[in-house]
């Protein structure tokens, strides 16, 4: 006879979950509160590929970036320093994002930003890598840990023109690889 294990029931999340992506908001790096309802009708490798994707569809695609310091503490700068670091260090070379960057936020754990609570509820795992949570447990710097947690920087979510979460992509998927799905969603938009 083996010992039986009982799993503790997951704690109820105290984060209010929005009914629609367009009910959400966040604060930009410039300190302005952005109501996501302004993106209604639009479809949302990194920084340079995100710029390229945004440039290809300037009127109908909206790229939103949310810096986070939960993955190996790689974003340890302040909100005020982020744009300067992007311009001069990473990726550098005078880089300026042509998409909206929001203030740093938590994407996992008890203080998960409502945007990510909503997205993870509707898309609990990346479509291209549904079984991996994280390859380096020593970098788990949040609690509670959930199966739907974002695994690393540059995990991406594509939201349709009516605000419905469409697909979630692992960090291994380059933004350029999202283009067929972006085109598919743009065809649905009227």
Segments and roles (model prediction):
Residues 26, 31, 36, 41, ...:
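Alpha-helical solenoid scaffolds in eukaryotic macromolecular assemblies
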């Amino acid at each position: 006879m083996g010992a039986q294990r009982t799993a503790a029931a997951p704690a109820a999340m105290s984060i209010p979950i929005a009914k629609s992506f367009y009910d959400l908001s966040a604060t930009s790096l410039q300190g302005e509160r952005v109501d996501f309802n302004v993106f209604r009708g639009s479809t949302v490798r990194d920084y340079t590929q995100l710029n390229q994707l945004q440039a290809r569809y300037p009127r109908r695609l909206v790229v939103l970036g949310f810096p986070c310091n939960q993955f190996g503490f790689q974003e340890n700068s302040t909100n005020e320093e982020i744009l300067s670091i992007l311009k001069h260090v990473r990726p550098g070379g005078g880089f300026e994002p042509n998409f909206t960057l929001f203030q740093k936020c938590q994407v996992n754990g008890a203080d998960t930003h409502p945007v990510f609570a909503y997205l993870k509820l509707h898309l609990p795992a990346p479509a291209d890598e549904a079984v991996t949570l994280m390859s380096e447990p020593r970098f788990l710097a949040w609690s509670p840990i959930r199966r739907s947690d974002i695994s690393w920087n540059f995990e991406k979510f594509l939201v349709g023109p009516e605000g419905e979460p469409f697909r979630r992509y692992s960090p291994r998927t380059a933004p350029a690889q999202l283009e067929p799905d972006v085109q598919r969603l743009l065809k649905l938009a009227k």
